From Swiss-Prot:
Keyword tags: Cell membrane, Conjugation, Membrane, Plasmid, Transmembrane, Transmembrane helix
Signal peptide: none
Topology in the lipid bilayer: Multi-pass membrane protein
Protein name from the UniProt record: Protein TrbA
Domain of life: Bacteria
GO cellular component, one term: plasma membrane
Organism whose genome encodes this protein: Escherichia coli (strain K12)
DNA repair found in the keyword field: no
Amino acid sequence: MSEDYLKMFTGVVLLIFVIIAGYFFSERNDRKMFLLSSLVFLVVNIACLYVLTASLWFLCGAIMSQGAALVVSIVAAALPDVTSFDRFRRIFICIMLSSVWSGVMWFFIRGLMTG
């Protein structure tokens, strides 16, 4: 197994560990939103780790970015649910906020790494 694949595997395991830990620290009502937000963050983080070089700084950035999924789920779950469309709106906001936040985080990390 090459060193890059080992770093990639380590990063994915750490990201999944952050998801499991966050699931138990999230409130009972926010767990579905947390899992949705974590899934979006996980997909973006794995894609960024695969495309970019899997160095220690990028692994730290991915873990930091994955930790933000808890904040996104709290924000999305705090929106009121009055009609059936509001539930779809909360899911849409959760997906979009997770994607944008993760993208901005990776842009910032990439900018720090390239100088």
